[in-house]
Curated annotation (Swiss-Prot):
SUBUNIT field: Forms a (host) DnaB(6):lambda P(5) complex in the presence of ssDNA.
Entries under Pfam families matching the protein: Phage_lambda_P
Transmembrane segments: none
Lineage: Viruses, Duplodnaviria, Heunggongvirae, Uroviricota, Caudoviricetes
Keywords from the UniProt entry: DNA replication, Host-virus interaction, Viral DNA replication
Function: Loads (host) replicative DNA helicase DnaB onto single-stranded (ss)DNA at the origin of replication. Reconfigures the DnaB hexameric ring, generating an opening large enough to permit ssDNA into the central channel. Necessary for the bidirectional replication of lambda DNA. It interacts with the ori (origin of replication) region of the genome during the initiation of replication.
Disulfide bonds: none
Name recorded for this polypeptide: Helicase loader
Family per similarity comment: Belongs to the phage P protein family.
UniProt GO BP: bidirectional double-stranded viral DNA replication; DNA replication initiation
InterPro entries: P-like
Length: 233
């Protein structure tokens, strides 16, 4: 029951349709299909028990559609292990409202709790770390001299910082990138991979082109810094 990735990949469309619509499965002597079905149904039952107001005044067709959306969300977002599901359920049980979260919210809970279990920050904490690094980086000769709590923190923050600078990321874009970085780093740690120590990195060049106002401001900054004179652009 620890890893159902292979079963989920091989779980054919008809079986998924039958489970989503609360119909009996057709196993064709495939015990792994029954196992996947039991896991999905068990998770859905836990969610409904945790959020009892979710199905109030809903008919069976609506319930079936909710089940279908959850099945699809698990498959599309790689929620393939009971460890991931249990991580999401730990967050779900801490909620103080009786309504079922969206499939996307539950997937985010699975990932966030998995990251925390692996010794990493959650998305909000990681973004705060990036902003703090932006404020304090000038106090240190280089990124490698910054007081990182772990090798993983170094790679997460510096990668996001470079991406933010190169592509002028908004706060919302930075948070999406942070979520992606945490998924990858969590997977590396869970595989037992040794995260390398900080090493000097070349600056990331390129990214989004500047508009005219930004270009003029950058030119003025360079002129002021080096005491240059010349005609305006």
């Amino acid at each position: 029951m620890k890893n159902i990735a292979a079963q989920m990949v091989n779980f054919d469309r008809e079986q998924m349709r039958r489970i989503a619509n609360n119909m009996p499965e057709q196993y064709d002597e495939k015990p792994q299909v029954q196992q996947v079905a039991q896991i999905i149904n068990g998770v859905f039952s836990q969610l409904l028990a945790t959020f009892p107001a979710s199905l109030a005044n809903r008919d069976q067709n609506e319930v079936n559609e909710i089940r279908r959306q959850w099945v699809l969300a698990f498959r599309e977002n790689g929620i393939t292990t009971m460890e991931q599901v249990n991580a999401g359920m730990r967050v779900a049980r801490r909620q103080n409202r009786p309504f079922l979260p969206s499939p996307g919210q539950f997937v985010a809970w699975c990932r966030e709790e998995a990251s925390v279990t692996a010794g990493l920050p959650n998305v909000s904490e990681l973004v705060d770390m990036v902003y703090e690094y932006c404020r304090k980086r000038g106090l240190y000769p280089d990124a490698e001299s910054y007081p990182w709590k772990s090798n993983a923190h170094y790679w997460l923050v510096t990668n996001l910082y470079q991406n933010m600078r190169a592509n002028a990321l908004t706060d919302a874009e930075l948070r999406r990138k942070a979520a992606d970085e945490l998924v990858h780093m969590t997977a590396r740690i869970n595989r037992g991979e040794a995260i390398p120590e900080p090493v000097k990195q070349l600056p990331v060049m390129g990214g989004r082109p500047l508009n005219r106002a930004q270009a003029l401001a950058k030119i003025a900054e360079i002129k002021a810094k080096f005491g240059l004179k010349g005609a305006s652009v």
